[in-house]
Every structure is written in C-alpha cells, then in structure tokens.
Design a protein with these regions (language model features):
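Linker/hinge segments immediately adjacent to helix-turn-helix/homeobox DNA-binding domains
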Residues: 130, 145-185, 189-280, 296
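Tandem amphipathic alpha-helical repeat scaffolds
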Residues: 2-9, 34-48, 70-85, 108-125, ...
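Solenoid-like repeat scaffolds
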Residues: 24-32, 58-69, 95-107, 133-145, ...
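Flexible inter-repeat linkers and adjacent short helices
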Residues: 1-70, 222, 234, 241-245
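Small side chains
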Residues: 57, 77, 170, 286-289
Length: 334
C-alpha cells in the first residue's frame, strides 16, 4: 500500500500522465516515497543512465510489495545488460518469471503476466504467457501499463513476422489512449516504426519515428531509441544523424552498450547467433540487405552512395565468414 492506503502500481513513472518535457516534475509530484524512488530509477534508466538507475532500484529487489519488486527487477535486469552484469541481469529477470501464489489479487497476476512476458519478449525469447491469458486481467492495470502491454504484444507479433497485426496493435493503442503517457507512447511509436519498416512503408515509419523523437527529446529519453536501433533499420541514421549529431552519438553509444549485454543472454538462450562484431552502420545495412533491399535502396535510405553500401556489405561478409545475402539471416535480428 502507498502512503494514501491504496495499492501501489508498478513502474510508477510509466503509469503517470504528463506532457513531454515535464518528466522531472511528474516524478517530484508522486506523493508516496517508495513509488517516487521507483519513478526516479525509471527516469534514470530511460535517460540512458544505467548505473544510477540500477543503484536507485536495487533496494527494492526483495520488496514485499509486488509492485515495487517487479519494478526493481525489471529496471535492474535491463540496466544490468547495459552494464554487462549478466549474472545480475539473469537473477533479476528470473525473479520476474516466478509466478505469484494463486491467492494474490487479479492485479498482481496481471502485472506478473505483463512483466514476465516483457522480460522474455524484449530479449526475443518465447513468452511464458499468451495474449489470451492476459486479456481477462488487463483491466486491473492502469492505462500507462495497458499501453505498455500493447507494445509487448505488438513486439511479439513483430517477432512472428506478423507485421500488419503488429502495426495495428500499436496504432490502435495510440488512438484509443485517454491520457498522455510519454514512456509507453514512445515504446508504441518505436514498435510501429519497426513494423512499417518491415512492410517497407518508409514514409509511415519515419512519421512514427519522428513522433517518437518529439516525445523523447524534451526529457532526454535516449535509452529506448538506442535499444531499438537494429529493429529500426536505419531510421535513426536517416532521421537524426545530420540534424541532431550530438544526440545521435549518444544514442549510438547506448546501442553498443545495451546490445553487447543483450546478446550475452539472447544468443545462448535462443540458440541463435546474432552478430556481435559489426558496427551499427554495418548491422543496419546487413539488416536491410537480408530483408531484400537493393544496394541502391539502402543507399537512398541511409544517405550514402551505392558503392559505400557495397563496400560495407563486403566487410560484413568478411567479418561473418559468409559469402551471400542469404547467409546473413542467421546473424541478424528477426
């Protein structure tokens, strides 16, 4: 219970409505001290300050209150990927997967299904729960978390190659929302951008990404953009590199840090071999190439010459020890 005697909600910042640019005020306005501490950890995480986020959330890893515990495990788990603390990440994420007792409230079961699914899907691993198991409990969560749940389900559809359904899930959530929840909306616009890129609707992908950036930039929310780099298939380069060079550099630094730790869990647990020795530019070009883009199309999208694309892809083949585009698929994100 919080200081008002009401049940706490997990990820209190994600659940707080505020206008972009007002995140610090939103955190300060949370009355309950423990919920405010979690919101502080969220703000640090989404700003790319993984070490400080983990430090702020760590005291709640064994909290009796499930809202505080799930929040802390989720924040510390993903922050530990960027910090290359893989045993810590595994411990935190494993704690999320532990099912609550049957006698717990529907709200607790809803938050468990959501965070257990998110902990798996965001690592591109199979979710322990289906959407059908979540739907009857969804109404027990606040709107900010329901929006995040829509992102998790959209991401799962994307991983199954159901790009149209993934896009519909994200866009419907954005259309139907009532309040302004920048964190969850950022997740959803990035998901929609991913789906549009895979459907080769570049204009729609850019529109969603530009909206995501308009949400992220006022509060410095670079972490999620960096984490989604490979799945955004060149949108970061196309939309930010020239106009926002300093922000772009920070985002790419975030990408390298997070993706290194992410692969330390994803690759052994999935049996896949997502490449870990490519630059972000090489990885993006390789992602587009294995999706059937021509060198000329890749060049136009990324603002370089076809010759540059050809040379970069030749370097990719050499690093991966392969000789054809068909062989790229085994080393790329889905």
């Amino acid at each position: 219970m919080n200081c008002d005697g009401n049940p706490r909600v997990p990820m209190s910042l994600m659940c707080t409505a505020f206008a972009p640019g007002q995140m610090d005020a939103a955190v300060a306005g949370i009355a309950d001290a423990d919920s405010r501490a979690i919101a502080t950890a969220e703000a640090l995480y989404f700003r790319g300050q993984a070490a400080l986020a983990a430090e702020a959330a760590r005291p709640y890893l064994d909290a009796a209150d499930p809202a505080l515990r799930y929040s802390a495990c989720f924040i510390c788990g993903y922050a530990s990927l960027s910090l290359n603390r893989i045993p810590d990440a595994r411990r935190c994420l494993a704690s999320i997967l532990d099912a609550p007792p049957d006698e717990e409230s529907p709200a607790v079961h809803a938050m468990h299904i959501l965070f257990a699914s998110a902990a798996s899907v965001l690592l591109h691993l199979p979710s322990p729960y289906s959407a059908e198991e979540f739907y009857p409990l969804a109404a027990h969560l606040p709107e900010g978390l329901r929006l995040f749940a829509s992102y998790v389900m959209a991401h799962a559809l994307y991983l199954r190659g159901e790009y149209g359904r993934s896009l519909g899930m994200a866009e419907n959530a954005l259309i139907m929302k009532q309040g302004s929840y920048p964190i969850s909306e950022l997740f959803l616009h990035l998901s929609a951008s991913m789906a549009c890129m895979s459907l080769k609707d570049i204009d729609a992908a850019k529109a969603h990404f530009e909206t995501a950036w308009s949400i992220a930039r006022p509060d410095g929310l670079i972490e999620l953009i960096g984490e989604h780099h490979g799945l955004l298939q060149g949108l970061i380069e196309a939309c930010l590199k020239q106009q926002y060079p300093d922000d772009f550099a920070r985002i790419i630094e975030t990408t390298y840090r997070f993706s290194y730790g992410w692969r330390r869990i994803h690759n052994p647990d999935s049996g896949e071999d997502v490449a870990d020795d490519l630059t972000t530019t090489e990885f993006t070009m390789a992602m587009l190439a294995c999706r059937g883009w021509t060198n000329a199309e890749i060049a136009r999208h990324m603002g370089v010459s076809p010759g540059t694309v050809k040379n970069r892809l030749s370097g990719v083949y050499a690093k991966l020890g392969i000789g054809t585009r068909a062989e790229l698929v085994a080393h790329m994100l889905r």
